[in-house]
């Protein structure tokens, strides 16, 4: 059984600039249907899911014919889901037509958001989430949640800093006293290797500030934190997922950053580690020369030159 999800993405660009794009993912039932790297299901996508009963491996396929720019999961849908986009441009010139393909997997910025989680994800021997990592996640989500409701609630910047410092102090003290596990109260088996939002803990530690905070501030902050908890869980879920990207372009390849080439197909192989921090970019270009046009221009140019030489020769004779 697969321990991660393997996804093959194929793109075939047609001479008219349109392109056929296909996703094919395989993995166990829990991983294949989660929201770590969801495949498109709505029109114009043709979506299909299957199960191999012999080894309990599930596969899902989604494909469509597209053109121009296609964005998967725009930023206005929140920070959680993995965003990626593809751009295929066709440019027609007098003597040739060029094609450019650009595929971008948006970087998740793990090292900047939660450095401890980044270290845990790079440690393949780690089987569970360290509680210190969980406090780091909570602090990041709290900070972002408070930032996202600034337009709704007006509180002083100094008050925000005091609240954040208070929570840091709570976690630090609990760690020093060996009670970090107790205050997080994460004992459920189905929460293993998954972050969750400790609502009661957060409500309790907002109490010292309740008199200076607007009504419903705490509840709004909790709600604003949820998408960032989802973001952390998706980041963790993407860990060890692998991808292959294959594409064909009309004409002669002039540029690519592909790992390898097989016949006319460009291949890239990578894992989620490639975009865990920075953007991962796939790019390729090709060109089709119009031989008949080039030949006509060459012949036409030669005739013009020949005619010019004849005229010059006649002028010299007349003179």
What are these regions (language model features)?
Residues 2-10, 311-316:
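Membrane-interface motif at the C-terminal end of an N-terminal transmembrane signal
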Residues 4-62:
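Start-of-domain marker
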Residues 12, 49-51, 85-87, 254-261:
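Short, exposed beta-strand/loop patches in secreted or surface proteins that constitute
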Residues 13-19, 25-29, 64-68, 249-251, ...:
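Beta-strand elements of well-folded, non-transmembrane domains
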Residues 37-43, 76-81, 259-264, 298-303:
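Short intrinsically disordered coil segments
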Residues 47-128:
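Long, charged all-alpha helical bundle/coiled-coil segments in cytosolic proteins
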Residues 106-296:
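Intrinsically disordered, low-complexity linkers and stems that provide flexible hinges
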Residues 286-319:
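C-terminal single-pass membrane-anchor helix
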């Amino acid at each position: 059984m697969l321990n991660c999800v393997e996804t093959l993405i194929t793109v075939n660009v047609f001479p008219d600039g349109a392109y056929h794009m296909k996703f094919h993912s395989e993995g166990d039932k829990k991983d294949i249907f989660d929201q770590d790297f969801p495949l498109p299901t709505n029109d114009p996508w043709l979506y299909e899911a299957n199960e191999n009963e012999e080894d309990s491996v599930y596969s899902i396929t989604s494909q469509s014919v597209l053109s121009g720019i296609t964005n998967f999961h725009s930023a206005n849908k929140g920070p959680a889901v993995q965003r990626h986009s593809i751009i295929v441009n066709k440019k027609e010139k007098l003597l040739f037509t060029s094609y450019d393909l650009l595929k971008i997997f948006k970087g998740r910025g793990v090292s900047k958001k939660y450095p401890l989680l980044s270290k845990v994800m790079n440690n393949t021997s780690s089987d569970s989430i360290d509680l210190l990592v969980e406090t780091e996640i909570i602090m990041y989500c709290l900070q972002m949640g408070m930032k996202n409701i600034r337009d709704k609630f007006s509180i002083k910047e100094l008050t925000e800093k005091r609240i954040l410092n208070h929570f840091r102090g709570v976690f630090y003290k609990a760690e020093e006293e060996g009670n970090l596990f107790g205050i997080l109260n994460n004992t459920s088996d189905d929460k293993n290797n998954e972050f969750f939002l400790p609502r009661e803990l957060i409500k309790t530690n907002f109490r010292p500030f309740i008199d200076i905070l607007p009504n419903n501030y705490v509840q709004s902050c909790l709600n604003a934190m949820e998408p960032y908890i989802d973001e952390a869980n998706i980041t963790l879920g993407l860990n060890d997922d692998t991808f292959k990207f294959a594409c064909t372009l009309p004409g002669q390849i002039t540029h690519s950053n592909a790992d390898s080439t097989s016949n006319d197909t460009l291949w890239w192989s990578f894992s989620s580690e490639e975009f865990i921090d920075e953007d991962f970019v796939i790019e390729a270009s090709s060109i089709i020369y119009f031989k008949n046009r080039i030949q006509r221009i060459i012949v036409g140019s030669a005739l013009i030159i020949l005619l010019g030489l004849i005229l010059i020769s006649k002028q010299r004779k007349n003179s």
